[in-house]
Amino acid sequence: MVKAVCVLAGSGDVKGVVHFEQQDEGAVSVEGKIEGLTDGLHGFHIHVFGDNTNGCMSAGSHFNPENKNHGAPGDTDRHVGDLGNVTAEGGVAQFKITDSLISLKGPNSIIGRTAVVHEKADDLGKGGNDESLKTGNAGGRLACGVIGYSP
């Protein structure tokens, strides 16, 4: 089993921890808790760079090695880093996601890349405009962190 962790932080009160686990070549289990969010849906994505020198903006665009459009986690036409939305209630999002496109090893590895929680709901590429097909219209980047191996 391969494990990884990401500590999310931003310029405001949003913070959290996300754990990743992968058995052999199987799907990745993503489990996390993010605090300080407004209630409702928030886009959650893996971005291409593990660079947070300019806050979350230097993390680049969504991790998209196959050069596809933005989409929902279950779509065939989606970025590898498109993990959909997390739902906050009482300011806290606790979630468990299983995804078979991201990996903790190999060409789709997310190790050294940045996880980002966004200010708005991800429209999952169904917004009917160009931005929807790039970002899901998920808005600003509230908090982020680089994903690294863990014991």
UniProtKB/Swiss-Prot annotation:
GO terms for biological process: removal of superoxide radicals. Its EC number is 1.15.1.1. It catalyses: 2 superoxide + 2 H(+) = H2O2 + O2. Zn(2+) binds at H62, H70, H79, D82. Disulfide bonds join C56-C144. The keyword Cytoplasm applies. GO terms for cellular component: cytosol; mitochondrion; nucleus; peroxisome. PANTHER family: SUPEROXIDE DISMUTASE CU-ZN -RELATED (PTHR10003). Destroys radicals which are normally produced within the cells and which are toxic to biological systems. Belongs to the Cu-Zn superoxide dismutase family. Homodimer, and heterodimer of Superoxide dismutase [Cu-Zn] A and B. This is Superoxide dismutase [Cu-Zn] B.
